[in-house]
Amino acid sequence: MISNGQAFFQAPSYLFTPIKLNLALHVVGQRADGYHLIESLVYFSLSGDCLSCTPFGSNRFVLTGPFADELVSDAENLVVRAHDFMCNTFPECAKPAFFQLVKLLPVASGVGGGSGNAAGVLSLLRQQWALDCSCEKLAEMSLVLGADVPMCLFALEYQQPLFVKGIGQDITRLKEACSLAMVLVNHGQQIATKTVFKALEKRDHPPLKIDSAALKTVDSLVEALQETRNDLFVPALKIAPQLSEVLCALDESGALFSRMSGTGATCFGIFKDKQAAQQAALFIKAMYPDWFVKPIVTLAKL
């Protein structure tokens, strides 16, 4: 029910939410409360879901897009939860809003789609409400929404790759890192994060060590990544054996390096340039028309 017809004449604020890509992910421990400690090299692309926010007479949320049917549109959705969080955290500024999310990314796919959406809400409302709250402070508070939300908020604010430690709260900006041309591939199987972590047999792997100088060029980064891991790949592979086929498809299309992101099932390939990535995406989509295939360029310094 539309309670304020004038709202449609107010210009909406919108953004494309971050795609989060764990180029390396080491699980180095586990806290007493069960949270796993990680060290991760994380790159981003602002080409995820499309989120818009319009001041409205009452709160409303509409979910559309090719992957909308796989999500709930009620109070459990991270867009709604993030709005509730902002209203409760800044009650003196809280205002009702109409959010529309066009779900363009696969669900439960290891690229932080839900966390990116939550970060998008925080970023839009921080601007609309003219909050006197730094990105760093808001990121610290937003950890209650999920471990990936703070880093996604940093991606929207600073548009740079990050080195992330702890449960996701210890964030270092990588200001000298180069941009990457990549292809994302998802074969369609959802993989629950909790299921992958539960299947992880070893929780105290060696830490992630990578020289910041290696991040300056594609070739040096690819070489450095050979000495890193995604410690969640082995348990994810037991759940989704087709991950091996996805990685083979990326390698056969000319990827310089390929790996699963996060807990899966999305895998990425790094290519020498944007043209090579676009050609590879066309090749993979032709071979596997039912797969999600997306060429992207990651955020980095200008």
From Swiss-Prot:
The keyword RNA-binding does not apply. It comes from Bartonella henselae (strain ATCC 49882 / DSM 28221 / CCUG 30454 / Houston 1) (Rochalimaea henselae). The active site is at residues 20, 148. Its EC number is 2.7.1.148. It catalyses: 4-CDP-2-C-methyl-D-erythritol + ATP = 4-CDP-2-C-methyl-D-erythritol 2-phosphate + ADP + H(+). Catalyzes the phosphorylation of the position 2 hydroxy group of 4-diphosphocytidyl-2C-methyl-D-erythritol. GO terms for molecular function: 4-(cytidine 5'-diphospho)-2-C-methyl-D-erythritol kinase activity; ATP binding. It holds the Pfam family GHMP_kinases_N. One of its GO terms (biological process) is terpenoid biosynthetic process. The gene is ispE. Pathway: Isoprenoid biosynthesis; isopentenyl diphosphate biosynthesis via DXP pathway; isopentenyl diphosphate from 1-deoxy-D-xylulose 5-phosphate: step 3/6. It is an enzyme of class 2 (transferase). ATP binds at residues 106-116. This is 4-diphosphocytidyl-2-C-methyl-D-erythritol kinase. Keywords: ATP-binding, Isoprene biosynthesis, Kinase, Nucleotide-binding, Transferase. Belongs to the GHMP kinase family. IspE subfamily. NCBIfam families: ispE, PRK14608.1. InterPro entries: GHMP_kinase_C_dom, GHMP_kinase_C_sf, GHMP_kinase_N_dom, IspE, Ribosomal_Su5_D2-typ_SF, Ribsml_uS5_D2-typ_fold_subgr. The lineage of its organism: Bacteria, Pseudomonadati, Pseudomonadota, Alphaproteobacteria, Hyphomicrobiales.
